[in-house]
Amino acid sequence: MVTRLWNLILGLILVVSSATAICAQTILVQGKVLDSRGAPLAKVSVTDKVDHSKHTTTDAEGKFSLQVAEQSTLIFSLTGKKTLEVAVSRDPMTITLEDAEETQKGAAVTTMRQTTSIQTKYYPLWVIDGVVYKQDKDFNTADLASPDAKRLIAAALPGLSERDIESFTVITDASATALYGNQATGGVISVRTRHAGQGINRFTYTTQLTYRLIPSYREFNILNSQDQMSVLKELEQGGSLSPETVLYQTRYGVYGLMYDNAIKYKNKQYYQDNTLEGQTRYLAAAERRNTDWFKELFQNSIRHQHTVSLASGTQVSNFYASLGATIDPGWAKVQSENTYFFNLNASFKPHRYWTFGSIVNASYSQSHDGGDFNSLTSASTFSRTLDPNQYYLYEFAPLNLKEEMKQNYQDDDAINLRLQASIAYRPSQKFNASLLGSIQYYGQISEFIRTEKSNVSERFRAMNKRLIRDRNSYLYKPADDVYAVPKVVMPHGGYRTIQDFSSRRFDLQARATYTDTFADGKHALTLVGGMDLFDYLEKSGWHDEYGVNFEIGELSTFDPLLFKWLHEGNRKYYTRKTTIDRNVAFLGNASYSFLGRYSFDGSLRYEGTNRFGKSRLVRWIPTWNVALGWDVTSEAFFPSLSPLSSLSTKLSYGMTGTLPFVYNSYQRIKPFLPFRPNDLIEPGLYLSEPANHDLTYEKMYELNWNLNFGLWDERISASLNLFSRQGRDLVDVAYNQGTGGFFKPYGNVASMEAKGVELSLTTQNIQSKLFSWTTTFSYSRNTNKVTKLNSHPDVSTLVSSSGGAAREGYPLASIFSIPFYKLSKEGFPLFYNYDGSIERDNINFSATENLDYLKYSGTLQPTDQGGLNNSFRWKNFSLSVYVLYSFGSVKRLPTQFSSSYYDYQVLGHEFNRRWRAPGDEERTNVPSIPTSGQRNSYPNLSRAYSTYNYSDVRIARCDYIQLRDISLGYSIPKAALAKTFLSSVDLKLQASNLFLIYSDKKLNGALPYAYSPHSIIFTCTVGI
């Protein structure tokens, strides 16, 4: 008994001494938080960096007090201010938070993950201030890793400047669909617009000047005029450019003009000396011409954007407003655009329980551009042998490209409006309810004008030769009289096409959130419930106005015969389309945390759509996601894991239900107008798709593992994601016996899988008061494979380069090629057939069996992408160098080989290596140029050259490394501005899309991606 009593007393002594030691190790930290102008800041979050349960906020006077361990570090954070970490002190602390507006850091973001759907394509979804904007197929997601990402995002969103964007977040895993539904299957780019923080009163002016360089032929696979004329002379010697052949084509170039001028007579002389010497002089001039169409059609101009913004904030209300204009005189000479925009982001808190918010975003733009002849396309498809001041034949009518740009153009007017209002009710720290409503409107009217002098209008009157009259489809010829002389249907004027597009979207979001902690903060629980609703209405259409005399007050002189020409040719002169998309979703989320280390998240979203009409069989689509997290940093043993400074991991699994490619849960009946060659008009109905009661939504199951860690006090930080996606019940062709008149209906018959790795790494190489060097590296790898497919694509589908093909056992968007053997002694291409035989023109493009002989060339989608950015700072100077890379994709080179060529065609550098004489087949794989005699001797020779275009030698890799951006910035020291009314002046000079460091030589100089102008951008930001 005595022993037990002694042990109890000893235990009490130990407990008391331990408690005393603990109390001795904690201190009461007190202080005050101010802004950069010395004003107190209320509601600043003050948190212990290690023990997050120790947390408080500043009062109305900016004061705080918190009991923490003696060696703790406190984190001070407030929206609109820079987050600050400060070691605790026993003395009263005075903390100053600087405005966060002055720094903009790029984020290391990987590209979007590949979706698992055979037929449906998903694109990144823009979400602005929590409201869905649209999917965007044109935005290059590789730009998200750029340090200049905000400027590129602003260029993609109407009415926003770079300064209007406060931050953006990229969501690529299954949580994207849990938040925004199946429309977010392609990933989400969530943009948050700027708003004023507390204690801010700032006026800012920003100007951005962009100088775009004129394109160069070094980036295009186009022969110069000397090499082009070498090909044309060989065609002439082979009998392919004779006058009787060239003059009656729909289009001609240098040879056609020479032959045409040789028979034109004026002022007692012919336009062209039709002698050998005269033709030689004419062709020699064309050979030396080397027209630079880029310089003819493009210009050196400066696009400038001006933005003024005003931000002000108090404890009760704050607002951010900006007004800006973008003036663009045009990269091409025919282009110009002016845009004006306004933004307002305001919040008001009249009571501690209630918060009201409103956002207004409006923009209006006017633009002028080329019409049927795009400047960049025309410059890259018009031969360099052509005289830019001369008229040539195009669709039986004369054409001068420079003059056509003046007579054939497009005018656009567009308006974009977004109104958003929100209300939040927070009666306690545990409960919060909010309601958000948004209305978005977009309207655009485009006028495509072809004046009476344009080539397009002159085609309606081209009938100066009998062969032209017989072949010109712009003339009217009665269907019941084969001997009738064609008639002009638009004898006067030109014509105009007016297109209009408008969309209206209404969104309503309701949320209720409950947050609580239990057992002294050991357990934390957050419950979220809500509903989303949107109503989207889209209207579009166009109509043609014929016989408009633009030079005499747009007088209308249409001919009634024109409507007969339209009707009998089964043509339309107007069309209208209306789309209604309605969706409602109910969602719930539960988050649980134990000791701030272990977490569980679960979410469920159930949404319905009107896409399937009255059918209820597949109206509702579920999406769910669960995740487990572990913050190893908070573990007691973590300090022993040196040099690790942070470590956390998360494992998630979820299923996303997505809309199928078709919506025929019930049969779909559509209207149509049967073609009648007479005046009878009899609308009809037809069965577009048979009913498929087994149709269900596509399912994507995703497993994702995330690992975040830091080394040596975050000098090195990394994030790693591994994911696996399984696509099931995918919609594709399901063959049947022709029941109901459909042999190839669509059904849930396919499946595929996708896997990937995403890595971002940031290293603080050098950190000092005067100099710092930071490196950010991003890498992503995405691969996929079709695991089940019922359809049987033929050869033409597999070798097509338009969108790639789906084939079981191979990646989606695959390209296959016909195996090339060698050239024959005549220079004709030869190929391997399915049975191993050598064929010239006997490859069956319609075959659906025995396809294993086709060579797998690769996929159109890159498998490996990323970027490398190095940022340097010395005093007030900053330098950034960004390199972008992409590997793993291929492309089919342009189909420019044929048994017949024309004098207006643009050819690539491959033709310099063409077969010219017997024996060349041993040194080159570029076929010869057939003569007219060879075409007569081998009637199927055209099939051989067509096959060559789809052979493996016409495949190039799209791997590239590009120096994307170099930027140099300078901030004028605040000490130098102390005696002025200015608070900050920031300058930045940037060069974008500089040059390729590496690309495949088979591209012959052409870019492996869509062309973007080389730009030099100067940005000046002045704050008051």
Residue ranges and their predicted role:
Residues T204-Y282, G747, Q764-L860, S900-Y901, ...:
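Conserved small-residue
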Residues H52-K63:
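Short, acidic Ser/Thr/Gly-rich low-complexity loop/linker segments typical of extracellular
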Residues I95, G106, I153, E162-T204, ...:
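A beta-strand signature from Gram-negative outer-membrane beta-barrel systems
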Residues I118-L125, K134-G159, G197-V334, D372, ...:
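Residues embedded in well-ordered regular secondary structure
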Residues T339, N345-F356, V360-Y364, L399-R450, ...:
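Extracellular/periplasmic, surface-exposed regions of secreted and cell-surface proteins
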Residues Y265-A311, N318-S322, Q390-R426, K487-H492, ...:
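Outer-membrane beta-barrel transmembrane strand signature
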Residues V456-E458, R466-Y476, S886-F981, V985:
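Extracytoplasmic gating/loop element in the C-terminal half of outer-membrane beta-barrel translocons
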Residues E101-D136, N140, S167, T177-G197:
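Extracytoplasmic beta-strand/coil segments of soluble accessory domains associated
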